[in-house]
């Protein structure tokens, strides 16, 4: 995993990694044409689609 990688969250869908936070958190941009959503998700809950 690195900044700019595409990832998938089971509930929130696909997103792009923006930054890494403390304690295993990853700041992910889940935004699409419906709106903007940027959230911190735990590293264990996401899977890498494209690095």
Which residue stretches match the model-derived regions?
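Basic/aromatic-rich interaction segments and small domains that mediate binding to polyanionic partners
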Residues: 2-51
